[in-house]
Amino acid sequence: MQRPWAEPYKIKAVEPIRMTTREYREQAIREAGYNTFLLRSEDVYIDLLTDSGTNAMSDRQWGALMMGDEAYAGARSFFRLEEAVREIYGFKYVVPTHQGRGAEHLISRILIKPGDYIPGNMYFTTTRTHQELQGGTFVDVIIDEAHDPQASHPFKGNVDIAKFEALIDRVGADKIPYINVALTVNMAGGQPVSMANLREVRKVCDRHGIRMWSDATRAVENAYFIKEREEGYQDKPVREILKEMMSYFDGCTMSGKKDCLVNIGGFLAMNEEWILQKAREQVVIFEGMPTYGGLAGRDMEAIAQGIYEMVDDDYIAHRIHQVRYLGEQLLEAGIPIVQPIGGHAVFLDARAFLPHIPQDQFPAQALAAALYVDSGVRAMERGIVSAGRNPQTGEHNYPKLELVRLTIPRRVYTDRHMDVVAYSVKHLWKERDTIRGLRMVYEPPTLRFFTARFEPIS
């Protein structure tokens, strides 16, 4: 008999949550325009909208807040953050930002010029938007398996080397300022990249003089998957695997609101001094002094402490296994989800869940709204709404993946909460034929998934 295991932490403080009535939730989602982003958090029972900034900090992180140096310039909290990034990630230079998209903004302004192409292993919403705002064009060079929810490839986040080289041949290396490799790949279902693939991408970049950049937002989860799945890494600590992963990159953008276990903050890290200088020039305009980048000193202290906590092997094993616990319950019930189960979330396959709803009636959006009405669980659409429109044609981008993301915050919920979520999804699966499509009645010009509004189709 296998010995049971428990969360590798004790709970010191709690926040009450409440279940509401179905009638209350029907009114709430109607007032929110059937967009879960527009719900009030007090009306949500279990909040799986995102793992960004919604994590529980440790007592050490709360203690670190009191150590924050709030000096306007040269705060010692910056140097503690810099030391943590150098020690754990291995990059020479660090520029703090208010969150990940602040770092995306900086590197896009520094490296991208109009007419450039930026290859990557699947798009991410804010990343692509910043690239397009600078006149660049994102090109997806992820392996084909990433677009198949049922493909069992252990590293579905891998870059397709042939696609990458074909792009270089087509547009020329001088039109490619860098390749952006996400670790893990959010839009593919939290899927990892193998160490072997990172080495191959590095070789191509070196051959053609192209920089290799990382969106390292969930790189620790990626490192854990390498430990589990890639030969030669089973006995290595996650901390060591992460350091090797980062050694292949010239720099990274980072949202500290995920891996680093904080509520706000991010950074841009790099090895080239000229990029550091440009970043410092830009951060003063858009974020603040280069030693705070829009953050309070206390936030930099909490990020630094979180960087050390995130590479604890017991912590990251629990984090991955809690996500897996939910996903395996759904698989046992025959519910279509992205496989293998990813690092930060379970992704429902809305196409397979609601085959009667065409993609231009937003099946993932409809499923997320239905889940909230059923149980008060808030999830996120990751399909055609998130994909936005083609900036040249104005037509919808039609992604192959139409998903609902059940994103699990770190150290916040217990497995009993996961049982409630699983029960609700199973109930909806039985009632799936009653779910109707939606029409969009308000659409903002960019990042529409945040604030768009919908209504049911009769």
From Swiss-Prot:
Homotetramer. PROSITE patterns: BETA_ELIM_LYASE. Keywords: Lyase, Pyridoxal phosphate. It comes from the Bacteria. InterPro entries: ArAA_b-elim_lyase/Thr_aldolase, Beta-eliminating_lyase, PyrdxlP-dep_Trfase, PyrdxlP-dep_Trfase_major, PyrdxlP-dep_Trfase_small, Tryptophanase_CS, Tyr_phenol_ly. PANTHER family: BETA-ELIMINATING LYASE-LIKE PROTEIN-RELATED (PTHR32325), TRYPTOPHANASE (PTHR32325:SF4). HAMAP family: Tyr_phenol_lyase. Belongs to the beta-eliminating lyase family. This is Tyrosine phenol-lyase. Its EC number is 4.1.99.2. The modification N6-(pyridoxal phosphate)lysine is found at K258. The gene is tpl. Its cofactor is pyridoxal 5'-phosphate. It catalyses: L-tyrosine + H2O = phenol + pyruvate + NH4(+). Gene3D superfamilies: Aspartate Aminotransferase, domain 1, Type I PLP-dependent aspartate aminotransferase-like (Major domain). It comes from Symbiobacterium thermophilum (strain DSM 24528 / JCM 14929 / IAM 14863 / T). It is an enzyme of class 4 (lyase). Thermostable. GO terms for biological process: tyrosine metabolic process. The keyword Lipid biosynthesis does not apply.
